[in-house]
Amino acid sequence: RINTFLHVNDRSISKRNGILICVNGTGILYSWLKRLFNQTPGSVSYEQMNAHAQQISAGADGLQVYPFGNGSERLLEGRHVQASIEQLDFNRHHAGHLIRAGMEGIIFSLNLGFDLLGTYGVPLQSIRAGHSNMFLSPTFRSIFATVTNTEVRIFDTDGADGAARGAALGAEFYDDASQAFESLKLIDTVEPDRALTNQYFDLYSGWKEVLDTAIHELDRNHTNLL
């Protein structure tokens, strides 16, 4: 349910394996929402989407999004649950609610992986992320820190920069890993919002309960077909 890989810090005298949580539907959900909101004239940017989400309170007024619409999920033991939107009310919910619920659904799905890592004894205290993708959003960073109950440290890097540094390290352009990454700058540190910790625990628990029910129904239907 998690991926193990040879880490860039691996050495013959100091073995290092990395572990990776992968949720196929996270990034594509947010890009799907962006495409959805750009069906009519007038472009909606990710910055505008993030601003809309910031205006909505925790829990998106009851709206729930499940970002599992991009094929089977290893985290869910290879199940193809499909994406869904739950508790949608046409009178209460608008685009901002959908964006906020999408953010929360992405974070909740990643937190499933964090729960799994915890069972393997992996310490979950601090997260380091690049200033890119969804971590560009202060709202996303705050929700992520609160739901996972971790300190989130944002550095001035992204996937392309990291890949280039790793390749240069492998080509022995740098003397060691410390030299390869010493120029990275910490640009933000986000702590869990303690005022929302209990609320988000309840929201995550409710979200997970619906997911567990969907998985149970999926498994039951599969068994009936055998």
Predicted regions and their residues:
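Glycine/Thr-rich phosphate-binding loops that ligate phosphate moieties of nucleotide
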Residues: 1-226
